[in-house]
From Swiss-Prot:
Residues of the Nop domain: 283-403
Residue ranges with Acidic residues bias: 433-445
Record-stated family: Belongs to the NOP5/NOP56 family.
Its job: Required for pre-18S rRNA processing. May bind microtubules.
Subcellular location: Nucleus, Nucleolus
Keyword Cell membrane: no
Alphabetized UniProt keyword annotations: Coiled coil, Nucleus, Ribonucleoprotein, Ribosome biogenesis, rRNA processing
Region Disordered, annotated ranges: 405-504
Any one biological process term the GO annotation gives: endonucleolytic cleavage to generate mature 5'-end of SSU-rRNA from (SSU-rRNA, 5.8S rRNA, LSU-rRNA)
Identification of the protein by name: Nucleolar protein 58
């Protein structure tokens, strides 16, 4: 005997098949291509309606996740049968879960059975009495919307997509600002080259251009709102003796247009930075307290979402952002990187070279806990107290490693050390009295004598070794010289013999 379990928007349907090996057929689509053939092959054995729309959503989610709900378990256990029957289901995970229940069913869920379910769902209204096509479509649409809302879990306060986009835009703005500022300095530098050396701030440079215009207006222009008094005097003095060339009004107009862009971009960047800071404190307050807004936002953007990042282990968080270096190290069998984006965190920056890796590991472990607290905690806490308390622990660990008191930014106040007033040391006049040299030798400690003897022995040994090395070197050099002399002598003898032969 074969049964087919069909999940609908209205409820669970258990269909009894006339052919118990129907699911093994290779021509299913041809055998079940009309409503009459489907109705002839399958009869409704049991049908369990859902109590409400919320109940339908709960059951649908259970099927998607591969869980057997209490309703489905009760529905299947009430089927009376003598022999073990075959149960065809559409979801493989659900089939495995039903098998574990130990019911009197042999569960089948494979690629071939999908054609069977496709044919049944196509002609489902004909099989289920009291359900017309329009009613079933409306139920399916309503359930689809409910599942969509459930998956999205939309919340105005927990939208981490805003953070991902904001940090990406912030990086783009920084690049644009740097490019525009460089272009503006090079452009206006032809007219007033000395200004770029005195004013390093790009926004202040652009505001001076907008306020002053050409350098001849410097003496009449008030720059007190942009620069301090001393710097203002320097700029005005430099403008009078500038080595720059003259520019036309059209040139100045275009330079001013670029300067306006720089000022506007800088103002928008500050606004975006404040927005990102507020969003981070709302979405991940504990992570923000631990690593800061920018590093936290970059970590979330790199992982894709706060939930994905919260599920990552501490080891992954530690090297997040250093994937290229990691895979290169694994490929070449070298040491793997110790830190990625966390390298720019203030706590890692305070550590010296040898301790950076240790602090990065500690910080990653604490960040993993803070992330889970932010993302998965049932109780909402925007204060970030947990993050500040964890940061204090990391700071104390850093202080222990560095051997010095580190500057803290946490809310946890350290206990102030009690100031002990000690008596000032007095001059000891008796220490001036010196004894004879013989007495001093007698009073010398035995430990010092031992050290001195060891030192003397070591020096003698080193001298002996040096002497032996020198003797060996001299012998070798002498031997080489003798060999060379012998060679020269033999050559000379040969030459003289040859000359004698030639004379003869």
């Amino acid at each position: 005997m074969a049964y087919v379990l069909t999940e609908t928007a209205a409820g669970y349907a258990l269909l009894k098949a006339a052919d118990k090996k129907i699911y093994k057929s290779t021509t299913l689509l041809e055998d079940l291509d009309t409503a009459e053939k489907v109705a002839e092959q399958f009869k409704v054995h049991r049908f369990e309606k859902f109590s409400s729309a919320a109940g339908a959503l709960e059951e649908a989610n259970a099927v998607i996740e591969g869980r057997v709900s209490e309703t489905l378990k009760k529905f299947l256990s009430e089927v009376k049968q003598d022999k073990k029957a075959t149960l065809v289901v559409s979801e493989t995970k659900l089939g495995n879960a039903i098998n574990k229940l130990g019911l009197n069913f042999s569960v089948v869920s494979d690629a071939a059975s999908l054609d069977l379910h496709r044919s049944i769902r196509e002609f489902l209204p004909e099989l289920l009495p009291g359900l017309d096509d329009n009613a079933l479509k409306q139920m399916s649409l309503g359930l689809a919307h409910s599942i969509g809302r459930h998956k999205l879990k939309f919340s105005a306060d927990k939208v981490d997509t805003m953070i991902v986009q904001a940090i990406a835009l912030l990086d783009d703005l920084d690049k644009e600002l740097n490019t525009y500022a460089m272009r503006c300095k090079e452009w206006y530098g032809w007219h007033f080259p000395e200004l770029a050396k005195m004013i390093t701030d790009s926004v202040a440079y652009a505001r001076i251009i907008l306020t002053m215009g050409i350098r001849s207006n410097a003496s009449e222009t008030d720059l007190s709102e942009i620069l301090p008094e001393e710097m203002e005097e320097k700029v005005k003095t430099a403008a009078e003796v500038s080595m720059g060339t003259e520019i036309t009004p059209i040139d100045l107009e275009n330079i001013k247009a670029l300067a306006e862009q720089i000022v506007d971009f800088a103002a928008y960047r500050e606004q975006l930075s404040n927005y990102l800071s507020a969003r981070m404190k709302a979405i991940a307050p504990n992570l923000t307290a631990l690593v800061g807004e920018l590093i936290g936002a970059r970590l979330i953007a790199h992982a894709g979402s706060l939930t994905s990042l919260s599920k990552a282990p501490a080891s992954t968080i530690q090297i997040l952002g250093a994937e290229k270096a990691l895979f290169r190290a694994l490929k070449t069998k070298h040491d793997t990187p110790k830190y990625g984006l966390l390298y720019h965190a203030s706590l890692v920056g305070q550590a010296t070279g040898k301790n950076k890796g240790k602090i990065a590991r500690v910080l990653a472990a604490k960040a993993a806990v803070a992330l889970r607290y932010d993302s998965l905690s049932e109780e909402r806490d925007d204060s970030g107290d947990f993050g500040f308390s964890v940061r204090a622990k990391v700071e104390s660990r850093l202080s222990a490693l560095e051997g010095r008191d580190m500057r803290t930014t946490s809310k946890v106040v350290r206990e102030q050390q009690k100031i002990e007033i000690k008596e000032a040391p007095q001059y000891n006049a008796d220490a001036d009295a010196g004894g004879d040299s013989d007495d001093e030798e007698e009073e010398e400690e035995p430990e010092k004598k031992e050290k001195k003897e060891k030192k003397d022995k070591k020096e003698k040994k080193e001298k002996k070794e040096k002497k032996e090395k020198k003797e060996k070197k001299d012998k070798k050099r002498k031997r080489d010289e003798d060999d060379e002399d012998d060679k020269k002598k033999s050559k000379k003898d040969k030459k003289s013999k040859k000359e004698k032969k030639e004379k003869k």
